[in-house]
Amino acid sequence: MADNLPSDFDVIVIGTGLPESIIAAACSRSGQRVLHVDSRSYYGGNWASFSFSGLLSWLKEYQENSDVVTENSMWQEQILENEEAILLSSKDKTIQHVEVFCYASQDLHKDVEEAGALQKNPASVMSAQATEAAEAAEAAEATEAAEAAEAAEAACLPTAEESLSTRSCELPAEQSQCMGPESSPQVNDAEVGEKETQSDAKSSTEQSSEILPKVQDNTETPKRNVITYSQIIKEGRRFNIDLVSKLLYSRGLLIDLLIKSNVSRYAEFKNITRILAFREGTVEQVPCSRADVFNSKQLTMVEKRMLMKFLTFCVEYEDHPDEYKAYEETTFSEYLKTQKLTPNLQYFVLHSIAMTSETTSSTVDGLKATKKFLQCLGRYGNTPFLFPLYGQGELPQCFCRMCAVFGGIYCLRHSVQCLVVDKESRKCKAIVDQFGQRIISKHFVIEDSYLSENTCSGVQYRQISRAVLITDGSVLKPDSDQQVSILTVPAEESGSFAVRVIELCSSTMTCMKGTYLVHLTCMSSKTAREDLERVVQKLFTPYTEIEAENEQVEKPRILWALYFNMRDSSDISRDCYNDLPSNVYVCSGPDCNLGNDNAVQQAEIVFQKICPNEDFCPAPPNPEDIILDGDSSQQEVSESSVIPETNSETPKESTVLGDSEEPSE
């Protein structure tokens, strides 16, 4: 592939995260020649989404990447006397402290694999076959009981008697099988046909009926469906699991950019239907719109009037500085106590509407956050938030598609060894890729995870604690099983942080029917499990075979859990990096905020440095007005081959973005 790459571009972008993808799209749209490369085999970097087996493959790849160091000196041949090289990192060190737990019933057989899964590459298949042969020989020498114990131990899975806090799986390289069957390949969801999907769904239903005859036969007292690990594996393509958990404010920068650039045509969205609060050990729904407030049975009539009066003030708070001037130096929590709000209302406003810290957020910060929340109400639904169908990882791919439409060239699994810098001008002139090809460019955009330790020696990073859970029920029993909810659990002690919980149902196209996908996020003070486990234990209970028959279980049950820490470089300025040329622009990974404003802001700043005075991602011209110069077939092939088309299984209730201000429901 390297031999076919042109050797001269205007902009080279390394990494396919959201900021880099927006920059690539904007530059390509403005007429720049763009090369967009990524050493990974998937789009999105730490913004990516995976099917279940894809996530297991990512975990295994992460472990192998942390253990193996590859050295390649081909770049040295491309460096001239008046040049020097800035080496890039071949190891992604942005993910740490990975721990996996599986609580679903362990009925897994070796021949169970993800429905519609693609074959591995030949080398992987041969390796898997050799491993299976070795395991078969071992299995022949052991009893069935020994096999079961051995499998559970090898998989680092807790038994039914062990609680969530008693068993950990810090992934070792030799125990990668703990994450699923060895036959689970990496999956490209869009390359599987619709017929396969339908037949696989049918076979999955038949398998479920064989496993659970009692559930279907018991018509008098129906019980919860028992979801097994085999079912999760087989329905793995139904999952789209985000590495980063975010929502889109309906009037946020990203929504505005999607509409302005017409990139919104590549994606569809679903409204967040519920804002929840966790107070005194219980989960309850928070009324936030005018209609919700007056229809609420939780609030008294006096509380409804008090809340509406305060929310009306928050929308116009900048016009009434005298109302809060005396409290600018105090926390928002203290300010709320002066506003004649009941403790119940104070809690709702602080943790579920403003979503700010009780101890660190100032009055102005709280008022600003509340105003933003209220201004986003009603544009597309009764809450301020939207979620992209198939996960957050769709968004970088949408912008990559736009870049490709305007001539951008894409290469995944294509690593860059070094940047080539002119000693006199201190400008970057070129890159040298894994094949030793030297590619010249005027501007270079790079995701910060590619920078080496030498370049980042003076940088102190923050960390984000993340947890991903697959559960069998909602944290608050819904009127409909298709609710999408956000919940903030306040910090309990000094030094800890509030935890944001986003619960996704199957209509978001992120999990199989009968399950929920739950994301937990907070700023790190310890490892992810240490930070988040207290909240997990409050809201959920680990699945056990005994409890599977018990209809009295109040909390939803965890079927599978993943914890990890992700690096947050959003607050790092370029001055912190050592000797970066002025035409090299660094993009950070995801931050801990709920929205995507930081990614859009940094993308626009970088674009204006590359293309000053150019419009940032303007709408594409009407296809009927385009006059093609020469054969356009090559461009059409490029567009169709770069990013998979939108999945045909889009639910009817999804939201299509547009300029209309009317709610879509």
From Swiss-Prot:
| Ranges of compositional bias, category Low complexity | 632-642
Subcellular localization, as worded in the UniProt entry: Cytoplasm, Cytosol
Q: Where is the composition biased (Polar residues)?
A: 167-187, 200-210
GO process terms (BP): blood vessel development; intracellular protein transport; protein geranylgeranylation; protein targeting to membrane; small GTPase-mediated signal transduction
The record's region (Disordered) falls at 167-219, 620-665
Key word ATP-binding present: no
Q: Write down the InterPro entries for this protein, in alphabetical order.
A: FAD/NAD-bd_sf, GDP_dissociation_inhibitor, Rab_escort, RAE1_2_domI_C
Give the record's keywords alphabetically: Cytoplasm, GTPase activation
**Signal sequence interval, chain numbering:** none
Q: Does the keyword NADP apply?
A: no
Its function, per the record, reads: Substrate-binding subunit of the Rab geranylgeranyltransferase (GGTase) complex. Binds unprenylated Rab proteins and presents the substrate peptide to the catalytic component B composed of RABGGTA and RABGGTB, and remains bound to it after the geranylgeranyl transfer reaction. The component A is thought to be regenerated by transferring its prenylated Rab back to the donor membrane.
Give the record's family classification.
Answer: Belongs to the Rab GDI family.
Quote the PANTHER family the UniProt record gives: RAB GDP-DISSOCIATION INHIBITOR (PTHR11787), RAB PROTEINS GERANYLGERANYLTRANSFERASE COMPONENT A 1 (PTHR11787:SF12)
What protein name is recorded for this chain?
Rab proteins geranylgeranyltransferase component A 1
Organism, per UniProt? Mus musculus (Mouse)
UniProt lists the gene as Chm
